[in-house]
Amino acid sequence: MRVAIALDKDDATRVYPGPFGHAPRYAIYEAGPSGELVLLEIRENPYAKAHGEEKHAKMRELLRDVDLKVGARFGHKGSLGAFPLADRVEVGPVSLEEALARLKERSSA
């Protein structure tokens, strides 16, 4: 399973505090069979400043290989966002380390 975590624009050790789709980049991890998460890449988000349904389609394409999206929050100005509720986890504006710990707890539950 692949996981994308929204990264803060100024501090790559923190989750981006705004809507998931506005994050400037994502840490892409592969979850192993025993729950370990291995960083595969840092992926830039060229659509961070875009808005609307067209952006949603572009975001789905950008993260088409990702199974679970992790961010501080999802949706913007009444929109539920580009991704189904089942495919995302809200963690709040926490450290990357805290977000990873929550994912590990979730996978062992």
Label every PLM stretch briefly.
Residues 1-57, 65, 88-109:
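Non-catalytic interface/targeting segments
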Residues 58-87:
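Mid-chain, well-packed structural core segment of small domains
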